[in-house]
Every structure is written in structure tokens, then in C-alpha cells.
Amino acid sequence: MMVSRLLKNYSLYFAWLTALIATLGSLYLSLVRHIPVCDLCWYQRVCIYPLTILLGIAAYRTDRGVVKYALPLVVLGFLFSVYQYLQQMIPGFAPINLCGSTSPHCSEIHWEIFGFITLPFLGMLATLIMSFFLIMAFYSLDKRLAN
């Protein structure tokens, strides 16, 4: 009961924290560790980076209405992550030619642990976590309006 109340009351903060960690992590890996960024990675970043600002402001203002704007970005980022992960993990997966000649190929694995955790996998995980917290925020909004 206490965990449920904690999740409902602070779900926007947890979603914002997840977006912040994902943003800072991707910036660290590209700017400090110099891991090359492919086009699909950029598309994922376009979906995640604005969430850091949107969710931060919404959490500060306790504006749960942001869910209807943030969730589509999260879902789109998830789809880009899944597509890139499939390109990396399934040999012969026919990629759509989104990658330009100057950027690294999207199917290249530049960082991997345990044989299956790659950067797109972490992107999928972050978007799933954000989706969970945003859905919790949405349902707590419905209950508050009903009371």
C-alpha cells in the first residue's frame, strides 16, 4: 500500500529521473567515451532529450497532464530502440537504409555487456521504465479527478 502510494505521488519525478539518467548517460558515452552515434541513436535522442525538460517542469508543477504529450515521445523512442536492437542482434535482419555514409552503421555494436545488453537495449529499458511511471501518473490523475 505504501509503495503504491509512493509510486502514484512521485511517478512524474521518477519518470523525470529516468529521462535525466538516460540523457546524461548518452551524453557521457558519446562526448567522454567517444562512442560513435549512428542515425537511429540520434532519432532515439530526439525522443528522449526533450523529456528531460518536459518531465522536469511537470514534476515541479505536479502537472500530470504532461502524460498525453510525453507518452508518444516515449513510445516512439521505444520503437526506434527495438528496431536498432533487432538490427544488432538478428543476423541478416534487413535494415531500412536510414544510416548515412558519414555515420557509423546502425547495426554495429560499440558497447556490450553480458552478450545482450547494448545501448539500444538500455534505450528500450529506459523507455519502458518511463512508460510505467507515466502510466502510473495518468491513473493517479484519474483517481484524483474522480474524488
From Swiss-Prot:
GO terms for molecular function: protein-disulfide reductase activity. The chain crosses the membrane at residues 9-28, 43-62, 69-86, 115-139. The keyword Metal-binding does not apply. GO terms for biological process: protein folding. It is a multi-pass membrane protein. GO terms for cellular component: plasma membrane. Its main location: membrane. It is found in: Cell inner membrane. Disulfide bonds join 38-41, 99-106. InterPro entries: DiS_bond_form_DsbB/BdbC, Disulphide_bond_form_BdbC, DsbB-like_sf. Required for disulfide bond formation in some proteins. Belongs to the DsbB family. BdbC subfamily. This is Probable disulfide formation protein. It comes from Coxiella burnetii (strain RSA 493 / Nine Mile phase I).
